[in-house]
Amino acid sequence: VMQYSGTADFQARFQRLNEFHERVIKNFTAYLVPQIELSASTSKEAVCVVFEKVNTGGKALDAFELITAMYAADGYELRKDWFGTEEGEGRHGRLRAAMRLPSAAEGVLSGVGNTDFLQAISLFHTRDLRESAKGEGKTGRELPQVSATRQVLLNLPLDAYKQYQHRVEEGFLSAAKFLIQLDIYRVKDLPYQSQVVPLAAILAELGRDADSPAAIEKIRRWYWNGVFGELYGSSTETRIAKDFIEVVDWVRGGSEPSTVRDATVRADRLDTMRMRLSAAYKGVNALLMNRGAEDFRSGQTFSHTIFFDENVDIHHIFPQDWCKKTGISKQVYDSIINKTPLTARTNRIIGGVAPSEYLARIEGDGAEPEEVNSRLRSHLVDPALLRTDDFESAFRKRRNELVALIEKAIGKPVIITEPPEADGDFDEDPTEIEDLGSDAL
């Protein structure tokens, strides 16, 4: 102001300065910063809730973020553990790459999040607290619960994290190996992401005890009962904790875990498995591949075709176009009973024609009829019924074969019931007309 006080245009310049002060400077000097005061007794879970309520950016303050802040107060950088640094890969990267196929960008554990990892550690920590309380003579309700809830995570001490982090990571890596052995190679084929947490914790706790054939058989039974009983779909925290304790005890000679006892599988569920997002739907696909199903055209097992990234997906055995023309109801032909894993190339050959016609195409490329019959049987498809386009008989027989396959996996009978009434959940399969790649489905 003093610099321009004697100039001819002082008034104009002064007016501009006033405008700048009013419109810019005052916005800074008069800005009110909101402040929320929380008492020292406020629980960590309540802090998260308050943050989520007032945060207009939409960023959730999840358990990992709050635990990161808690550990930082003790000089420990949890984010570096998980995400890594320029100098080295973090735990997230190692899990994401675990058992990754050469043709894939990520492995079967790519869906494991930081909260999943903390949950597994929490199972060990709360188990230790419970055992310690038992040693002090406490019983019944006096004993703390083994738990992996959000509230428990927010009280996970740094010492417990340091104690179990490497053991739990090894458990997740063992879980990846376990899933690969079940022919579950990709995260999109994983029935339940939530079931990976107790699986990793169980394998971490058992260590080499999990390697015996008897132990592997029990863990597999537990896993498939969880999948086909559809017990990990929602509200899983209690089941995760129970399974961690009960499956380990079962492997070491105890009684059957509640997941194995609770699982109820009905035959009519096969008729309503139509959506690719269904855990049981994915489970049937994995069981078929695990029993050695071979591609109709190439005769390769699906461990090989997935390894070489040949776009394996689940497709109709009796093509949907043919079914529509024949007058078969969508609720019938769209179920998992009429679907099986096939490569995209084989599915293009199948197209929308009658099975007898596409089998002739396959054999026209040089495959012997008995070779093709063997491949069909590997999918639990009756060759004679498929060759005569007998949908009803083939459908009924394959339903029975799939029931037997599931019974073998879960180690107990499936409840036999009549097929249900129609519902509205269907899958479209555009690749029967034109291959769009498995990622388009």
Where are these regions (language model features)?
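Intrinsically disordered, low-complexity N-proximal targeting/linker segments that flank membranes
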Residues: V227-I314, W322
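Histidine-centered nuclease catalytic patch
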Residues: T305-N338, A354
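Basic- and aromatic-enriched surface patches that contact anionic nucleotides/nucleic acids
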Residues: V1-D128, R186-V187, N225, R361, ...
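Short conserved micro-motifs at the rims of enzyme active sites and ligand-binding pockets
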Residues: K44-C48, L129-E136, A210-D211, L231-Y232, ...
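Conserved structured core elements
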Residues: S41-C48, A60, N155, K162, ...
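A cross-family structural signal marking well-folded subdomains
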Residues: E65-I67, A105-L270
